[in-house]
């Protein structure tokens, strides 16, 4: 099984679309394990994550772990949590933050990796890019609406907002997220982690 994971990783590194990164010695940033039970899908990694080769090692990551109710060790070392961004590379900065993930990247690589993770019980969709792509929703559907209606997408998918500090105002304006959504998320994650 490890051979298949390594083959996919090598294919990602060698594909022409990623040549600009490979030439700079930049490796794709994701984590996929045959024993994974939870899959976290978010946007592309940020610049700091790419430089450190460590995802979610910032305030957003701490908040995400709090929301999930998992420890640092469970998040990074249990091998029960896969992390698959919509793009495995930091693509640069735009006018309003990091550039979005490439449109076809996840379509090409995610299915190959997911096929090797047969024990996934819950896919957590973090933010708009992941939610719209995986739930096949038009861009006109707002992330707030998606998260409010999260139960529609269970038991396979659980959409949430991005845990960025920039979303603090959103969290204050939408108290139902803390009172209704997060307890359910934590309950489901804990149940799966204890299997």
What does each model-found stretch correspond to?
Residues 1-148, 153-194:
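A polyanion-binding, active-site-adjacent surface
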